[in-house]
């Protein structure tokens, strides 16, 4: 895909405490590489990737394929950058909420991040995937899978255990979030059937005629 050659622009935001591995996770997803020497993110950074999203018909058959430009925003986890980070919440269409499987404190802080999300996101129930990162370090693990799954079930969101080092579930977790977002937009379009004018967007249904950045009420 060339610049501008896409149907949808989707912005995702990676959230979580400093040191949980957000930067290495996103780098693994966009470049399929692992760099353990990244320095702590200061403020906001982002990476990009183009993907093809295949829709499914009611009968389960493959539908139309859409070209999606993903912007993956990487946020600083430190408290001093919190006001800057929350300013980006309303622009994001989905969230990768991450904690470190080797840090119980980062897991406990997921609740604080959820509170900030619910207060600052574009709606009260945005699309979120909970991610327990550093699954490649089982000997250092402090958070068991049952704890994490129970928390994800409480919030009604998917949960994945990932590793930026090995690539485990990195792509799958982002694909799951994208699928949630695209299905939300499709339902929104079906309900409204009104022309979308955002960024010269689509004609009220997922027809992929022009690049569009869409949001939908929760």
UniProtKB/Swiss-Prot annotation:
GO terms for biological process: anterograde axonal protein transport; multivesicular body sorting pathway; positive regulation of exocytosis; synaptic vesicle endocytosis. It is found in: Membrane; Late endosome. InterPro entries: P-loop_NTPase, Rab27a/b, Small_GTP-bd, Small_GTPase, Small_GTPase_Rab. A motif (Effector region) lies at residues 38-46. GTP binds at residues 16-24, 74-78, 133-136, 163-165. Disulfide bonds join 123-188. Keywords: Acetylation, Disulfide bond, Endosome, GTP-binding, Hydrolase, Lipoprotein, Membrane, Methylation, Nucleotide-binding, Prenylation. It comes from the Eukaryota. It catalyses: GTP + H2O = GDP + phosphate + H(+). The modification N-acetylthreonine is found at residue 2. The modification Cysteine methyl ester is found at residue 218. Transmembrane segments: none annotated. GO terms for molecular function: G protein activity; GDP binding; GTP binding; GTPase activity; myosin V binding; protein domain specific binding. CDD domains: Rab27A. Small GTPase which cycles between active GTP-bound and inactive GDP-bound states. In its active state, binds to a variety of effector proteins to regulate homeostasis of late endocytic pathway, including endosomal positioning, maturation and secretion. Plays a role in NTRK2/TRKB axonal anterograde transport by facilitating the association of NTRK2/TRKB with KLC1. May be involved in targeting uroplakins to urothelial apical membranes. Interacts with SYTL2, SYTL4, MYRIP and MLPH. Interacts with RPH3A and RPH3A. Interacts (GDP-bound form preferentially) with DENND10. Belongs to the small GTPase superfamily. Rab family. This is Ras-related protein Rab-27B. The lineage of its organism: Eukaryota, Metazoa, Chordata, Craniata, Vertebrata.
